Amino acid sequence: FVMLDLDIGMQDWLTAPFAWDDAHRMDRGKVMTAAELEAGRDFGRYLDVDGDGIPFRTYPGTHPTKGSFFTRGTSKDRYARYTEEGPAYVDNMQRLLRKFETAKARVPAPVITKAVKPTKSAVVWFGSTSAAMAESLAALELDGIHLDQMRIRAFPFADAVAEFVAAHEHVFVVEQNRDAQM
């Protein structure tokens, strides 16, 4: 297997046909409607109303005068108004920390596979390295090298990622980034 993102992205790859259920409705999260805006519901693009760090949003064009916003960088308040005030910056950073904690419990958990024999060594990978890892792990098994395995599927990392790493003396991280992205 050639382990190149470029190869994956530029070549035609065969897959099993995708199945789609036309009755399925996507959960789009906290989206404020035109009716809610018209009724005067408080909309702040960075306003955390329930403590999970994830604010409501609107779709472009939802309402002709309400629900739109413009922002730049991190110098903004809960209502996307420009500010250089320290407390507003701290408030936004604390909201982002809450958002990350919320997301850790909602994103797909890592896939953890125990080695066929007890080991204190492990390997961690993610993304397009998966096919190469399957091939490599099979070859290592034939050579008598057994590794616990974890395929990370999302960021921010679930608590299980830190627990997995802490449980091993040696952890090999396989990725395709010169500067150790993971």
Which residues are covered by each model-predicted region?
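Flexible, low-complexity linker and terminal segments
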Residues: 1-182
